[in-house]
Amino acid sequence: MHYLIVSYSHKNTDIATRERLAFDNGVRSESFLRELVANKFINEGILLSTCNRVEFILSVKEAHKAGDFLMEKLSEYSKIPKEELSERADVYEDTGAIHHLFCVCSSLDSLVVGETQIAGQLKSAFKFAYDGGFCSQKLSRAMHFAFKCAASVRNCTEISKNPVSVASASVSKAKDILGDLGGDTAIVVGLGEMSQLTIKHLTALGCNVILVNRDKAKAEAFAKEFGGMVSVEGFPRLGELLNHHKMLFSATGAPHTVISKDMVEPKSFRRYWFDLAVPRDIEAFESETIRIFAVDDLQEIVNKNLSLREEQAKRAYGIIGRFTQEFYKWLQSLSVDPIIKAMREQAKEAALKEITKAISKGYLPKECEKSVEKIIHNSFNTFLHHPTIKLKEISEEPQSDTVVEAVKLLFGIQEDGLMLDRYKCEYDTTSKEREE
């Protein structure tokens, strides 16, 4: 089994291409994951799609063949040539894949380093795949460890202190352009997490908000939190509103644009629109009085954020490196523990068999049975103590697979008999004890 991650992000793929690769946690994601795990080289899969990245987190039998199949299917889905997809992709295998996953979950690979949205987005992607039956033991282990790593990074560094997000970066950009936003009015389209964060940042600066959403009841319930600073309108009024206000922020998660050029009326005042969605909500067009900012246009603020957090990022990378090593040590110990148990069970079974035989032949009085059992039990525990310790030590070394397979062969231990499924994510229940 191998871990494989294929990544398209703000680092290697422009926003127009990311739009074509984007998925939502719906029918398209389900259908794509079903095709992937049906392939004989792919065991499990998780699909992460956000405004800044599309990543395929896989457990595979053969990385090269699994990756090739993924590229074929992704080309069919996106209508992007397979060769271009291969050239753009960042591909990570095994240790590299786990390290990358931990970096992503800890927000070190984010456009805005230290933002906390990505961990929640990964949890949603994991839950979607798990509930759909597209991932099980192997990826569950990696994901649970990733979440623990991200928590450790947050707790042991200040990388998420006063975090900058795409939402806060867009509001900061608007403030840089327009100055004090107090008393101004901005339109916010959609009520997803990004829109909610944007509204919180705007109202904190004293800016009033007109929230445009299809579900007015849900929007009105959210608006109540802001004491009259947020009013709600339905989508039919969007065309009218965007022609009367200078600020607009959109993050709907729709698979198509919701604001088109033909909705725009000529006005004398300048307008600033922030498209925080991928795929983009706003149709790309040229205008002398409207400036449209997409996610990738916030790089200046992001770079400032990076420099401020550079020292904390170094500490975070150290934590991630340690967690990556711990993860593989833990995986290897999982494969050893059932073998040790099987060895002890064999010794116990042989001892009990001989005791029963001795009693039946009159060599041993029945009343001595329990005492002899205890003596023999202590004897084989003593005998197996050193091999057990040595096997656990070897399990942390590169050659562990060869040694473990040899032990299984010597003792006649069958893989099916180990019941490795029982060991699904033991780290969740034992790590706290180890950390204490």
Curated annotation (Swiss-Prot):
It comes from Wolinella succinogenes (strain ATCC 29543 / DSM 1740 / CCUG 13145 / JCM 31913 / LMG 7466 / NCTC 11488 / FDC 602W) (Vibrio succinogenes). It holds the Pfam family Shikimate_DH. Gene3D superfamilies: Glutamyl-tRNA reductase, N-terminal domain, NAD(P)-binding Rossmann-like Domain. Catalyzes the NADPH-dependent reduction of glutamyl-tRNA(Glu) to glutamate 1-semialdehyde (GSA). The active site is at residue 51. Disulfide bonds: none annotated. Pathway: Porphyrin-containing compound metabolism; protoporphyrin-IX biosynthesis; 5-aminolevulinate from L-glutamyl-tRNA(Glu): step 1/2. It comes from the Bacteria. CDD domains: NAD_bind_Glutamyl_tRNA_reduct. During catalysis, the active site Cys acts as a nucleophile attacking the alpha-carbonyl group of tRNA-bound glutamate with the formation of a thioester intermediate between enzyme and glutamate, and the concomitant release of tRNA(Glu). The thioester intermediate is finally reduced by direct hydride transfer from NADPH, to form the product GSA. Homodimer. Possesses an unusual extended V-shaped dimeric structure with each monomer consisting of three distinct domains arranged along a curved 'spinal' alpha-helix. The N-terminal catalytic domain specifically recognizes the glutamate moiety of the substrate. The second domain is the NADPH-binding domain, and the third C-terminal domain is responsible for dimerization. HAMAP family: Glu_tRNA_reductase. It catalyses: (S)-4-amino-5-oxopentanoate + tRNA(Glu) + NADP(+) = L-glutamyl-tRNA(Glu) + NADPH + H(+). This is Glutamyl-tRNA reductase. Belongs to the glutamyl-tRNA reductase family. GO terms for molecular function: glutamyl-tRNA reductase activity; NADP binding. NCBIfam families: hemA. InterPro entries: 4pyrrol_synth_GluRdtase, 4pyrrol_synth_GluRdtase_dimer, 4pyrrol_synth_GluRdtase_N, GluRdtase_CS, GluRdtase_dimer_dom_sf, GluRdtase_N_sf, NAD(P)-bd_dom_sf, Shikm_DH/Glu-tRNA_Rdtase.
